[in-house]
Amino acid sequence: MLISKRRMIHALSYEVILLVIIAIALSFIFDVPLEVTGTLGIVMAVTSVFWNMIFNHFFEKFERKHQLERTVKIRILHAIGFEGGLMLVTIPMVAYAMNMSLWQAIVLDFGLTMCILVYTFIFQWCYDTIEKRLGYTPRHS
């Protein structure tokens, strides 16, 4: 199996929980209907998945062509390129859906990114704890 059941559960639970948190938080903070923030979250998540596939395809071609080693510097450039490219697409979405200026959308997107970093850490820690209690031991290949 290309993707294990465990990985699918992990990815789906991560995305669904994040989507619910963001949709509710944005709706509450900006007094925007939950349908708007929920739809925005779904569209942004789908966009992120497609951008991930496209960006990584071309990044890996670039990597092979230039025989780059995956150093910390390359990973930082990869992360900046990925997030920067994603922001070029999602900031106008945020501005439109939330009825705000591009500058406000940039600030909001940056704030969301910082919150998602914290969420990711907490989610991973909780997920690891749950797996440990269930007796799962990760195998490293």
Curated annotation (Swiss-Prot):
The keyword Ribonucleoprotein does not apply. The keyword Electron transport does not apply. Induction: Induced by chlorhexidine. It is found in: Cell inner membrane. InterPro entries: BTP_bacteria. NCBIfam families: AceI_fam_PACE, PACE_transport. This is Short-chain diamines transporter. The lineage of its organism: Bacteria, Pseudomonadati, Pseudomonadota, Gammaproteobacteria, Moraxellales. The gene is aceI.
